[in-house]
Amino acid sequence: MNRNCIKFLLIFLFFSFSTKAQEKFSNPIIPGGYPDPSICKVGDTFYIVNSSFEYFPGLPIHKSKDLINWELIGYGLHRKSQVNSTVNLIDVQSNGGIHAPTIRHKDGIYYIITTNVYYDEEREKADMVNFIITAKNPAGPWSDPIHIQGAPGIDPDLFFDDDGRVWYVGNQMPENPNFEGEGEIWLQELDINEFKLIGGKHL
């Protein structure tokens, strides 16, 4: 009886250590500068996109099956024609550029929605352009940026509701802030075919 218990214990310890050895991974999982991650899962694959600020190509996209091993598969902004008009990365400042993207998938289409920040030094003001790009393959090619007119603030997100409607969710500065840097969350329905805000805004 004792011999069987010892055998069982040894087998248990062997598999425990083997499992722990397989669970080891490096931190950070994706080394380098990949802040503000947004992730979505399609089938058995995870896709992640990050801020890229003033760098081009921009919006790096990685994929993974296990959330540990990641492969860079492309960039949302990969053509110069994407960044010289609505989105300006030609002479953008080092504290501007692409901030806090969101990646989503619906009905075979991938969406990235994000903010381009451009500081106008003459006016001492930051211009913020919220825009969407789309692709049928997350590795690209991605569409030209589509400016979401009437969408103030930063950190945009997309919510696909069960009733078929799509909502734009954003963060903006309130009209009468209680403290410096205060933000408020707002949402508004988005026509996902025309990429236009419709209906009223909800705070």
Where do the model's predicted regions map?
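Carbohydrate-active catalytic/glycan-binding domains of CAZyme proteins
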Residues: 21-203
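Bacterial Sec-dependent N-terminal signal peptides
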Residues: 1-23
